[in-house]
Structures are given as structure tokens and as C-alpha cells.
Amino acid sequence: MEPWFQKEMELSKEIVKSAKDVSNKAIIFIGRTAGEDKDNQATEGGYYLTQDELSMIKEVTSVFEDVTIVLNVGNIIDMSFSVKYNDKIKSILYAWHGGMEGGNALADVLCGDVTPSGKLAGTIAKEISDYPSDSNFGDDRVNLYEEDIYVGYRYFETFKKDSVLYPFGYGLSYTTFESTVISSKVSDNEVVISVEVINTGSVKGKEVIQVYVSAP
């Protein structure tokens, strides 16, 4: 089965301009419906944005200087629009499929009641062809890992650093943090790292401490 999406209503310049009369900020929602056996396809309405969605982004960014994109999707989609309209799109939020409380959680973040603290659990590349799994994607008989052990961020870190648009572990916040390693201890069975985290911003928030290791 193919992934499906809700067709966007036609968005005229007049509608966008009338919205600008009541707010100086705009929020664009883009959605995808995915599930088992119909996660994604390299088509418009799947991995790629539709022409209606691209037109919507173009119209809104032509009027608004401060635009937020909310992606209500089940998987990473093409993010090239973030480069093209980088001067107007101030933030992009992957809301994923949040379940019955997803709407409340999203509203809390957008209204500033909660500071976002999530980090990307996958690497977002510039082009779909940059992913090593692209050539084997969609085979309904077998999952072929031609990239061997270089799955996900390992592949980009090793072979294609310049192809990364948003790296594994990336994420923005309404505040800023300063992290300092206090101590680290290595034994035969474990590694213990103590980190001091200081909120250097003006609002409360949470930070994800990320530790990366490699073979000696």
C-alpha cells in the first residue's frame, strides 16, 4: 500500500495577505499518513512535497518574515525547502505522529509553555540519493543493507559529511545550555561520565547530553 496525504486546499495570495493583517508570524502544517508496510515512497506526497505544498510555502514566505513549519509525519521527508527559504523559515518542528496527546504537546511547545528539547534520531541528508539505502529502498521481499555496518549517521560521518543537511542529534531550543565534562572513568565493564549542565538562557528548559564513542 502507498502512503497517503490530505490534499491541500488552494491558498491564494489574498488569503495569505489577510492572515498577515492579524499576525506577523505564520505556521505551516505539512502531514503524511504512514504505517506498517506503507511508510514512504520517493514520490510527491510521500518523501517529496507536493506541488500544492511547495506553492503554499512559497506564498506564505513571500508575505511573512517569520515562518514555522510543523511536520506531522511518520518519517523524515525532503527538507530542501528549508534551504531555499532559509531567510524566512525560522524554525521547523518534527511533530511526528504524537498520538492522542500529540496535539496538546504541540500546542504547549508552539505557545512557549514548554521548551522543546528533542534531538534528531536520524540524519537528514540534502538529497534522497545521499542515503546509502536509497538504491534498495522499497523491496518487499528482503531488507538489503548494502552499506554493511555503516547504517544511519555512521555512513555520513565516515563517507559523506558534506551531504548532511541536519545531523544526527541536532535540535534547537528556546534557551541555551553550557555543558562541561567534570569527570570520566573507564573500567573493564563501564564508562562513567559526569557532566555539569548550566542553563545560560532566559527560560527554563531541558537538555539532552550526547556522548559519542569510537573504537580505540
Predicted features along the sequence, with ranges:
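C-terminal non-catalytic regions of proteins with extracellular/luminal or membrane-system context
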Residues: 1-216
